[in-house]
Regions:
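N-terminal nucleic-acid-engaging modules of covalent nucleotidyltransferase systems
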Residues: 2-428, 501-504, 508-518, 547-551, ...
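Short beta-turn/strand-loop junction motif enriched in small, turn-promoting residues
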Residues: 192, 359, 454, 471, ...
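Flexible, glycine/threonine-enriched loop-and-boundary segments that flank and lead into catalytic domains
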Residues: 260-281, 285, 429-435, 451-491
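Short glycine/proline-enriched turns and hinge-like loops at secondary-structure junctions
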Residues: 293-295, 458-462, 478, 494-499, ...
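A short-motif feature that recognizes glycine-rich, charge-decorated loops
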Residues: 310-311, 512-548, 557
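Beta-rich nucleic-acid/ligand-interaction surfaces
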Residues: 427-434, 454-458, 465, 540-558
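Detector for conserved single-position "signature" residues within domains
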Residues: 437-444
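C-terminal structured "cap/appendage" subdomains that terminate the fold
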Residues: 535-592
Length: 624
């Protein structure tokens, strides 16, 4: 133990709180987790990340496995719990000043400016004090993963009068007993700055190898994850009871299901061909996809990214409570869309984002009214409905959602905030074209074409669902959602901002983001300023382990932010790695004349971005 700190006496009760609550089923030294963190930071290989994680998981006792899985991803719970680790910088600085004897805030601030990371800065200061042999006035407690987790959990849940002081003391209690290396990662966790490049699929690969000796069992873990969205709980069940217990995990109310996704095609004819000549066509709305969980006592709303967004839409919650009184438990999927009350016209996605505010919810409700358009049902009264065919699920929601509005006022939010997504059965391209015209005139993006006998496969992207947008002359028939992975500094008017962003498509087969274009057009001055600020918190020192590109960038980022672009065509490129060698040896696929549409896809995870398979399909369509 390094005695670099002089703890304050009043911190001891909080230390005791953590120790009393430890699980007696075995502990894991936090230093071992730190060793693994450091190895992961140094690697740029996804395979090496997996190897490091396998070694860690094998040495982790079952009682701590869920905590380790959460912590390596920089969280305490699954995303749907909505519990964040981030703590204000000023509070962390106060905790440091109470924990480190003789701390010079000026020196710390200077180191912080140099490193850009408070954890790195504090580690330098603490290391420098080692040689002074400062001795603790009180016996210190052991730093275990369980203790760190429980303390962070208490910090995240502490609210009300005096909460700031309590949080500072809890942070100090950890820093008092940390080595310089441990303190570095404690602070990274507290401030939400842990960037190890560990994706969900990497964790599942490692769990399968560590506990079943076969990566092929990842598919079982993935199925469980798709219906529960909780990797920590899956890991705990796997470690304690084995793979057979994981197979028994089912859909549960208030645990969001990973959404089923659609493939894309360029023409109505191809869509029908995929559907063997008959299909359902639904309006594709320009809103936010949400999942509604209604139980006896409460209603929760989850975003496409599985984040809890209930507080953003209290009007939708109220409408659901009124409309579905007779149904005790239900999980629905739908699209929330902003509406102009004067014209009853649908408004674009950007207008809906005004509802994503923490304060002034009532004002936002009045200024940006919304309606919910339901298109699927996944669960009713403790029974999953995902194995039913599409047409049977549609019949169910038609019985559940009673539409009381007239045809002339389909979006009259004063009378009815819930409606069914308009749908029709189509048997030829002409019927699709006619319904497409109706959708576009109603303010929609296009159509969703769905196979009548398809089941709902959580987390899957397949041709059972196809998205079809209106065709544009001299441009691709659809926009693309791509992930920002790097940037070049701007020149001239763009000095002090980024001049171009490197964008990547997602390769689901290998869980890698592969570059497909640099985009520098379509941005307003405000866009450039906003991106510079937003991307700063995702900036990393080297190319991310899950990014594949031949391009050299001035700056690299974690693959986190998804933006929408349009382009003239997909072309072969020796410089970009998306779909490398799929069409021609040593050539990937790139976008020609890409342009930012102005839309940041906050509703999408990086893994929801355009897949390289879609790029290949779009390229082949051009050649026909």
């Amino acid at each position: 133990m390094i005695l670099d700190f002089i703890p304050l006496k009043e911190h001891l009760p909080y230390l005791n709180y953590n120790i009393r609550n430890l699980n007696n089923g075995g502990t894991l030294d936090f230093s071992y987790l730190v060793d693994t963190f450091e190895k992961m930071e140094r690697t740029t290989s996804r395979l090496m990340l997996t190897d490091h994680l396998v070694s860690l998981l094998k040495k982790t006792p079952p009682s701590a496995i869920d905590k380790v899985v959460y912590l390596i991803q920089g969280k305490l719970y699954p995303d749907y719990e909505g519990i964040e680790l981030g703590l204000a910088e000023k509070m962390v600085l106060r905790a440091l000043s109470q924990s480190i004897a003789g701390l010079d805030i000026g020196s710390l601030s200077k180191a912080y400016r140099e490193t850009g990371d408070l954890g790195d800065a504090a580690s330098k200061i603490i290391s420098a004090k080692k040689n002074k042999n400062q001795v603790s006035l009180f016996p210190s407690e052991k730093m275990t993963v369980e203790r760190v987790y429980l303390t962070l959990d208490k910090i995240s849940r502490t609210t009300g009068p005096g909460s700031q002081e309590l949080k500072i003391r809890l942070v100090s209690s950890l820093l008092n007993d940390s080595t310089a290396r441990e303190a570095r990662f404690v602070l990274k966790l507290i401030m939400g700055k842990l960037r190890l490049g560990i994706a969900d699929y990497t964790v599942m690969d490692a769990l399968a190898i560590a506990f079943t000796d076969s990566k092929s069992n990842r598919s079982i873990l993935e199925n469980a994850y798709n219906v529960t969205s909780d990797l920590g709980n899956i890991a705990k069940i796997l470690a304690a009871n084995g793979i057979e217990s994981v197979k028994s995990l089912q859909i549960t109310l208030y645990k969001p299901i990973r959404p089923m996704l659609a493939e894309r095609v360029g023409t109505a004819g191809e869509a029908l061909e995929r559907m063997t000549g008959i299909a359902a066509a639904e309006y594709k709305l320009d809103g936010e996809r949400i999942q509604i969980h209604k139980g006896k006592e409460r209603i929760e709303l989850f975003s496409r990214r599985l984040e809890k967004i209930t507080h953003h839409f209290p009007d939708i919650v109220e409408a659901i409570a009124k409309s579905l009184k007779s149904t005790e438990e239900i999980i629905l999927e739908g699209e929330v869309v902003a509406v102009d009350l004067q014209t009853l016209e649908l408004l674009p996605f950007q207008e809906l984002m005004h509802r994503r505010r923490k304060h002034g919810i009532q004002e936002a409700m009045e200024e940006y009214p919304v309606v919910l358009n339901v298109f699927d049902v996944l669960y009713i009264n403790r029974n999953a409905k995902t194995s039913l065919t599409y047409i049977k699920r549609r019949d169910l929601i038609e019985k559940i959602i009673v539409q009381q509005h007239s045809k002339n006022k389909e979006y009259d939010t004063n009378n009815n905030k819930i409606r069914l997504v308009p749908q029709t059965i189509v048997k030829n391209p002409e019927q699709i074209s006619e319904f497409m015209t109706s959708a576009i005139q109603s303010g929609c993006e296009g159509l969703m074409i769905k196979q009548l006998n398809s089941i709902y496969r959580a987390g899957a992207r397949e041709y059972a669902w196809i998205k079809l947008k209106r065709e544009y002359q001299s441009e691709l028939a659809d926009t693309l959602d791509l992930v920002i992975v790097g940037a070049l500094y701007g020149r001239g008017r763009r000095v002090g901002k980024y001049g171009a962003l490197l964008l990547a498509a997602y390769d689901s087969a290998s869980d890698i983001f592969r570059s497909t274009c640099k985009v520098g057009t379509g941005f307003t001055d405000k866009d450039l300023e906003d991106f510079y600020v937003t991307l700063e918190k995702h900036r990393i020192e080297h190319k991310h382990a899950r990014v594949d590109t031949r391009m050299e960038m001035d700056v690299w980022f974690e693959p986190k932010i998804v933006i929408e672009v349009i382009a003239s065509e997909v072309t072969l490129s020796p410089s970009h790695t998306a779909a490398m060698a799929s069409i021609r040896q040593n050539y990937g696929l790139a976008l020609r004349f890409p342009k930012f549409t102005g839309k940041v896809r906050d509703d999408k995870n990086p893994e929801d971005a355009t897949d390289v398979r879609e790029l290949i399909s779009m390229y082949k369509q051009q050649m026909q």
